[in-house]
Amino acid sequence: MECIELDNKIKITDVHDLDLAQTLDCGQSFRWKLQDDGSFHGVAYGKSVTVSLDKTDMYIENATADDFKNIWYSYFDFSLDYGKIREEISTIHPVLNEAAKYAPGIRILRQEPFEALCTFIISQNNNIKRIKGIVERLCENFGTRLDDGEFAFPTAETLAKLSPDDLAPLRAGFRNRYIIDAAQKVANGEVKLDSCFTLDYEDARAELMKITGVGKKVADCTLLFGMHRIEAFPIDVWMKRAMEKLFPNMNGDDFGQYAGIAQQYIFHYSRMHPELF
């Protein structure tokens, strides 16, 4: 893999095991929008970029080689060999083998921890389209405006100064109270997000569950997508259905150290095959 600087964009060569739609529009992150030309425009780590793929060449507009080194290499999880991981986990169960073959371009995004926490609080009893709308309004109302008119995700410190009523423009309902509680506990150090990278898994989950409204599912999603705890195995309605129907008598522990990656293959496969249920 090589990063080449071009005019206001970078080209990354030899990119494998990445499908932008499967990765950016599958319920991991809620700030990416599909463009008419097949590219995706989004904001992460305070950077507004457009990402496209041409076979094994990836282009990131409005980015530099330093941005790739410091942000995007990690964000797209290029340090992991997903081909080898698929080979390993596909031996666990025939249905998982089928699911991994169905969407081999899924990668686990390494998102900002606080953004992952808030967006999965918002995801409770919600659909992807509505989640994206709430997240967009949260950023437009309380995030820092970027040069191109987009908005960064607001910081915990910014949101901690607000009340649930201040979030009324989001139209997020009961989730407003949870967002403010999360921001306040992160900002004042009661909940230490950085510790969740290294704590034992159950302790990391318990740390996040100090926040009002954060149960196991939101905590597991935050750990998987915000801390890259790829042993996490979030269970939502789709996954509960999939486990009962396709993997009876199995649980997340049965999928090993890459359970979170297996979960994404199963989640996507289940959503795309409703006839199985």
Identify the function of each model-found stretch.
Residues 1-277:
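HhH-family (HhH-GPD) DNA N-glycosylase catalytic core used in base-excision repair
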